[in-house]
């Protein structure tokens, strides 16, 4: 039997979700905001690596906990995927066990404790924003660096194996219909729903006519965005408007 605490929710975030300035944290932040607006009491757990603590999150949540991401060679040599094993704080588990509220794991990155026996009586929800092993496979194919190629292929293999832990979730919330279909096919014992990305735009604000340039916006430290930017640069001379 799954025990829940009504109107309270633990959210485990892969990063500090404010400011909401890139894709993953935009979804997390505006989800927190939407839930808080509906009167849900949120206990937020953030893995921290480069982004500072934020008063904005304290204002929205009942409590906010921050944990260091355990990066380095030891985490990279684990049988678990690096993006997951480096997010394994025992303090997180201790805080999750302080009550019986449901737990929302934001992305496979945060699912180190998803299958932990101490959480077996808890309602566990996973927000799936990618099919991670596919994503890392494409990153491996896209890079020219031999070291990065080996790392991405290894991480893809480990993610494919670790993904089987999703069978311990009660719900998977996919961000696209394609991912919903994938997870529903591979994990028939789990309830899979499609809930599109949360964001701050409440209505379309487009102006009549057309603009004077194409704008590319992306975090260039992410290889996928870097490769896209390079392709667009090659296409730029053929475009009818300037590319910014």
Positions of PLM-derived features:
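Helix-loop-beta element that forms the nucleotide-linked donor phosphate-binding surface
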Residues: 118-121, 164-199
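Membrane-proximal helix-turn-helix segments that form the acceptor-binding/catalytic region
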Residues: 93-94, 132, 144-172
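Active-site proximal beta-strand in glycosyltransferases
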Residues: 102-103, 119-140
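A short beta-strand/loop micro-motif in the catalytic core of glycosyltransferases
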Residues: 103-104, 152, 168-176, 242
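Conserved catalytic-core segment of nucleotide-activated headgroup transferases in glycan assembly
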Residues: 27, 194-244
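Short N-terminal targeting/anchoring amphipathic segment
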Residues: 94-112, 123-125
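A short, charged, and often flexible helix/loop element on the N-terminal side
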Residues: 64-92, 144-152
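N-terminal subdomain of nucleotide-sugar transferases
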Residues: 1-63, 98-100, 236
């Amino acid at each position: 039997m799954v025990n829940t605490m009504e109107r309270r929710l633990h959210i485990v975030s892969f990063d500090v979700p404010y400011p909401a300035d890139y894709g993953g944290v935009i979804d997390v932040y505006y989800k927190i905001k939407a839930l808080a607006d509906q009167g849900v009491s949120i206990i937020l757990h953030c893995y921290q690596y480069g982004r500072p603590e934020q008063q904005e999150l304290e204002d929205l949540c009942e409590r906010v906990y921050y944990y260091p991401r355990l990066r380095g060679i030891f985490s990279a040599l684990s049988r678990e995927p690096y993006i997951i094993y480096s997010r394994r704080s025992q303090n997180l588990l201790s805080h999750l066990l302080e009550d019986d509220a449901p737990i929302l794991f934001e992305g496979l990155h945060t699912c180190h404790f998803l299958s932990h026996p101490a959480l077996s009586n808890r309602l566990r929800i996973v927000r799936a924003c990618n099919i991670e092993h596919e994503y890392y496979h494409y990153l491996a194919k896209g890079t020219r660096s031999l070291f990065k190629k080996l790392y991405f292929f290894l991480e893809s293999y480990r993610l494919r194996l670790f993904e089987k832990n999703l069978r311990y979730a009660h719900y998977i919330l996919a961000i696209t219909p394609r991912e919903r279909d994938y997870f529903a096919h591979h994990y028939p014992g789990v309830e899979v729903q499609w809930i599109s990305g949360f964001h701050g735009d409440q209505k379309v604000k487009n102006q009549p006519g057309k603009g004077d340039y194409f704008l590319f916006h992306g975090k260039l430290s992410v290889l996928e965005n870097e490769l896209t930017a390079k392709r667009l640069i090659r296409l730029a001379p053929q475009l009818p408007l300037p590319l910014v």
